[in-house]
Amino acid sequence: MNISSRKAYIDSVFGQLHFQITGDGNPLILCHQSPSSLDMFSKSFEPLAQSGFQVIAIDTPGYGQSDAPKRQPTIKDYSCCIKDLIEFLNLENVSLLGHHTGACIVAELSLMIPEKIHRLILNGPPLLTNEEKANLMSMIEKAPKMKPMKDGSHLIDLWERRKQFTPGWTDLDAMHRGIIQMLRVNGDEIHGFKAAFSQDLEKVLSAIDIPTMILTNTGDDIYFAAKRASSLRPDFLFLELQGGTHDIVDEQTEKWVESVCEFLQNS
């Protein structure tokens, strides 16, 4: 099967928003974690397209190839950018999937335009307490800022930093590509985290009224938060893959794609 893929931009309140479309089936929007880009889903594009989806992956403003915001965005700001893209592409009956920060974004978006949403997948929703948010934010803010060094040691430092927050990592390619995305944001990765930690995700989750699945994996660094979200909404389908890290799409591509397709196509 010949799968078509193309990249494009639209204008947003934060500048140009970059996205990639693969396939020609039912629309499925993918929103990435922080700090990352649409590249975190790249291994899933073709198998999802082969399963009948038009995969629309988006670089959140400030990440990947989207322009950086000149002010601190909120999750609603990010969601409005995707809403504008849905309108630009004239999409209906759209499925949404977001990972970590992306889960916050698509959850918010599902409340904005529920009439356009078919199904929702929250991959590792960060339902955290205020104390947990404060602790994580403190760690992120205290992390050394990357400064280019003549001997290239800043690249080693960045590699060690990602190793520290990816315990149990196994996929070298995912680690390498993750470092590339961290280099892209050039120390400005904090926007996505601040937006996610400022959102009242519990309130948002409580208001969702469309078919939803919470997808997680037992090796995810916020696996506990996904379990907490499931306890809040026991009516949502809950599915956990075994092991892995926040690079689960790379580590277990086939199982991840199968889980996504089974939920979205079982209607």
Which ranges hold each PLM region?
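N-terminal cap/lid segment of alpha/beta-hydrolase-fold proteins
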Residues: 1-16
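Conserved HGGG/HGGXW glycine-rich cap/lid loop of the alpha/beta-hydrolase fold
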Residues: 13-14, 18-65
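Flexible "cap/lid" loop of the alpha/beta hydrolase fold
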Residues: 107, 111-112, 118-149
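Serine-hydrolase catalytic core
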Residues: 196-209, 218, 227-230
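Conserved loop-alpha-helix segment in the C-terminal half of the alpha/beta-hydrolase fold
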Residues: 212-250
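Post-His helix in hydrolase/transferase enzymes
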Residues: 249-262
